[in-house]
Amino acid sequence: MRGEPAFFEIGVPDAKRAKTFYGELFKWTFHPMGGGDQAWVETPTIRGGIHDEDPESRIDIFFAVPDIDAAAAAVRDLGGHADDPRPEEPGFGRFTYCRDNQGVRFGLHQPSVA
């Protein structure tokens, strides 16, 4: 499970428009999450989310790790940057954003135990 793509996030200014676009394109069904038009989707191979009011439109890939705190420390030891991991999101796990030693943005994901 270490290093496999585990989750993706689509950050956009308008989540409603993104849900319509990706829903039509890939035939995805979105489930409400949080407030507003934020949502999550379960594809045949990976879970993902759409959030809005993001100043930079982008897609982030999160890689699975068994221990997010240790993985974030390893990113830093290797010359990258890792935000402090977020608390557990029930049903989803823990997440953090990172940049590698050349500035490429990616995420780490520790899946929920339950």
What do the predicted segments below correspond to?
Residues M1-K19, I46, I59-F63, S112-A114:
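N-terminal beta-strand motif that seeds the catalytic metal site of vicinal oxygen chelate
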Residues A6, I10, H31, A72, ...:
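Vicinal oxygen chelate
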Residues K16, T29-F30, D69:
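Secondary-structure boundary/capping signal
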Residues Y22:
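Catalytic core of tubulin tyrosine ligase-like
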Residues K27-I59, R105-Q110:
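Conserved short beta-strand elements that form part of the metal-binding/catalytic scaffold
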Residues I46-G49, R58, V65-A74:
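Residue-level hotspots at or immediately adjacent to binding/recognition sites across diverse folds
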Residues E53-E56, D67, E88-E89:
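Short beta->alpha connector loops
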